[in-house]
Amino acid sequence: MSKRPADIIISTPGSKVRRRLNFDSPYSSRAAVPTVRVTKRQSWTNRPINRKPRWYRMYRSPDVPKGCEGPCKVQSFESRHDVVHIGKVMCISDVTRGIGLTHRVGKRFCVKSIYILGKIWMDENIKTKNHTNSVMFFLVRDRRPVDKPQDFGEVFNMFDNEPSTATVKNMHRDRYQVLRKWHATVTGGQYASKEQALVRRFFRVNNYVVYNQQEAGKYENHTENALMLYMACTHASNPVYATLKIRIYFYDSVSN
């Protein structure tokens, strides 16, 4: 903000006089430009970072992850799943090598954030039954991917085969890490029916993915840190359908 504004308003109880300070300016006849009034609250909120507490400097997230470079790229996965009691799995870090804004440049990139939106719903025959069904979602990092994704029952240990009690097996704790976990619930019946539930989640993960020399974006081409989405419903006999659109925002590594 200028130390010497163009106009000064001199206020008296009886009158208001506007004086101009640029008398010799060739633009002295132009209309006065209104200046934006800045309140104390705005100036305090937008104060420089060195005047803020250390917490703002320690825990702020950079725009570009460490060791990466822009631009920010996007890859979308759109699918419909038949979620059953024994679980379902999909890989959400499948990115093909290329030169576009949906491709990876080399073997390494960082998935900064994930946006998951869609719904879970029941068909006409199932929603008439009196029951409640919840879908458990697990966003998992696979640190050492091999061959093909493991099933839900191979990764998680459950009590009485109940997905709501699922935890990573002790033998896989070094390989699989649950980054996020959430659920959505639908209810069937004649009266208190909720036949569909919306799913909308945004997560910041900063997951560094490494591929091999292959160009195709497949699970078997991962060598480190594949992102997996595991799903399972809590009702043993009534399945649930999930229509999801998953977008990952990633940056290429500078070491490619």
Curated annotation (Swiss-Prot):
Coiled coil: none annotated. A motif (Bipartite nuclear localization signal) lies at residues 3-20, 200-247. Gene3D superfamilies: 2.60.120.20. A motif (Nuclear localization signal) lies at residues 40-54. Its main location: virion. Homomultimer. Binds to single-stranded and double-stranded viral DNA. Interacts (via nuclear localization signals) with host importin alpha-1a. Encapsidates the viral DNA into characteristic twinned ('geminate') particles. Binds the genomic viral ssDNA and shuttles it into and out of the cell nucleus. The CP of bipartite geminiviruses is not required for cell-to-cell or systemic movement. This is Capsid protein.
